[in-house]
Amino acid sequence: MRITILAFTLLVTACTSQIIGTDEHIESYIGSNIADAQKLYLTPHSQAVSFWESRTFAWVETQTPLENGETQHAFKNPYRDCTINWVADQNGMIIAGSHSGEMCSP
């Protein structure tokens, strides 16, 4: 019985440790080209809605030019309250990122 509980605990810990948070995800893209983020967010993918149902969708991008020549790229999830914001310089390199919304955490 103890071995079963230990094995189950190890399995759960191993699986949950693979999930990165939204902040870590954003940090990992700083220094990348905005085209990499666009490819990730604008490519349709399937997400589970319930045990029996899933939806295929892509995030919606809004670009806002900033006064200093940089561009803010906001990627909105159409089904959840989550927006990922990237600021890219004139060369398309991501220099900053943030998120907003109640459902951005994994």
Report the location of each language-model feature.
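Residues within mature, well-folded domains
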Residues: T16-P106
